[in-house]
Structure formats: C-alpha cells, structure tokens
C-alpha cells in the first residue's frame, strides 16, 4: 500500500495491536499485506500521515491497523454454535477460493476457527483496448524451461499475464476465557503461507531482441506466524 507517497517500511502495518513491520522490511515494494485474510477482518483503520508518536517507528506515511473478528460468547449462558462458508470463482484470474469459519460459545469460553484456501491463476486483461494507446501491457512472449534450457515462447493469448499465478492458505484460531463480566483472556493464533509470488513487473521485461529478460523472479514464499495473548 502507498499512503501519502510512502510505501514499504515507511507505512506501518498493525495486526490486532501488534506491529507487523520488522527489521528486514526493505524500502522497495512489499507484498506482506496479502498474508492478512480479508475474510476474518472485523475492521480496518487507515491513518494518513505521520503516526510515529502514537504507533512508533515506520509510521511516516501512515498506519494501517487490521483488527480481526473476536470469538463470541453465548448470550444466554447456554452453548451456541455458528459458522459460515463460501466458495468463490473468478474468471479474470481463474480464482478458486474456499472459506469456512466456526464459532463455539459458552458462558465463559469461546472459540473461533477460520480457514481460507485460494488458488489464483494468471491474470487476464481485456482483449479490446484504446487503439490510440500502446499495448505494452500485453504479454506477447514468456520464458519457460524446456529440455533444461530457458526458452522464449510466443503467448497465444497476449491478454493473459503468464507468470502472475500463486496459491495461498490462511488459518486463524482464537480462544477466549471470561471468568467474570470484567475480565477476558484471549489467545490469538494466525498462520499464513503461500506459494512463490511472482514479481510480474520483472518477468514482463524484455530485452532489445524482444525476449524476456528474466525467466524467474519470485517473492517468498512468504510465511507469517502470529501468536498473541491479551488480557482485557
């Protein structure tokens, strides 16, 4: 994300009150925010401008505070269970996603479990464009490994951005204990992993001969393990 012209290690990402930025965050483009499952977010606060006084270092351009859903207790003291699930298919990137969540609530205990698995294919742009503009966005050639050699192949469908596909898995588990009406203990566990995330802007570069400059250029695979205990 870019806030007020700043990005990467100049924009602070906070998850459930815990800063996500660390010492290895570089100043170039970052994809760490994709490790946050949008299906478990309760609210997202975006603060534009410097916020280092309140949130600490790295908040030069702004702050993005992600707050995930909480485990819900039974309202009437009796056991309550709720949940939801969905599947999603998308033609623009051949997306196949599956999400399921279950909430179990008692008078003093509560549990929230969430699982999201996604398989994103290569992005596909529209075939028709402005004839008065260039078509540099088209993927006319791509690199592949054939017979143990890097080979440039012609893309039969230039609107398909070959090399932009990846897979992702997101898990969340929250356990809450409320001994009385004034105190709540919460254990928050989150895990996210994915396949290699292609850096498409590099893979789409071509040399003077029209061939791809790079056969492979990946981010990751990024893995995020989050564990937090809170007492309210």
Segments from the language model and where they lie:
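Outer-envelope beta-barrel architecture signal
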Residues: 11, 77-83, 96-98, 107-111, ...
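Surface-exposed beta-strand-turn/loop segments characteristic
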Residues: 112-167
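Transmembrane beta-barrel strands of outer-membrane/channel proteins
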Residues: 85-91, 104, 113-119, 187-191
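N-terminal periplasmic accessory domains that precede
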Residues: 1-2, 13-14, 30-34, 46, ...
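Flexible loop and strand-edge segments within Gram-negative outer membrane beta-barrel domains
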Residues: 162-170, 176-232
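Outer-membrane beta-barrel proteins
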Residues: 22, 96, 120-126, 184, ...
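Short acidic/polar hinge/loop motifs at secondary-structure boundaries
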Residues: 20-50
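Extracytoplasmic beta-strand/coil segments of soluble accessory domains associated
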Residues: 1-19, 42
């Amino acid at each position: 994300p870019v806030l007020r012209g700043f990005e990467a290690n100049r924009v602070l990402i906070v998850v459930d009150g815990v800063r996500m930025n660390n010492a290895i965050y570089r100043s170039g483009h970052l994809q760490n925010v994709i490790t946050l499952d949008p299906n478990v977010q309760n609210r997202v606060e975006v603060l534009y401008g410097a916020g280092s006084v309140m949130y600490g270092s790295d908040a030069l351009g702004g702050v993005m505070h992600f707050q995930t859903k909480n485990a819900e207790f039974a309202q009437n003291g009796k056991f309550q269970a709720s949940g939801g699930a969905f599947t999603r298919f998308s033609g623009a990137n051949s997306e196949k996603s599956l999400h399921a969540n279950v909430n179990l609530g008692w008078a003093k205990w509560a549990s929230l479990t969430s699982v999201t698995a996604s398989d994103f294919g290569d992005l596909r742009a529209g075939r028709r464009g402005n004839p008065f503009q260039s078509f540099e966005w088209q993927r006319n050639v791509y690199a592949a490994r054939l017979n143990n050699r890097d080979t440039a192949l012609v893309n039969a469908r230039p609107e398909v951005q070959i090399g932009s596909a990846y897979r992702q898995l997101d898990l969340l588990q929250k356990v809450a204990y409320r001994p009385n009406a004034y105190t709540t203990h919460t254990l928050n566990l989150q895990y996210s992993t994915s396949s290699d995330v292609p850096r498409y802007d590099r893979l789409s570069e071509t040399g003077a001969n029209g061939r791809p400059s790079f056969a492979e250029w990946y981010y990751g695979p990024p893995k995020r393990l989050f564990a937090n205990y809170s007492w309210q």
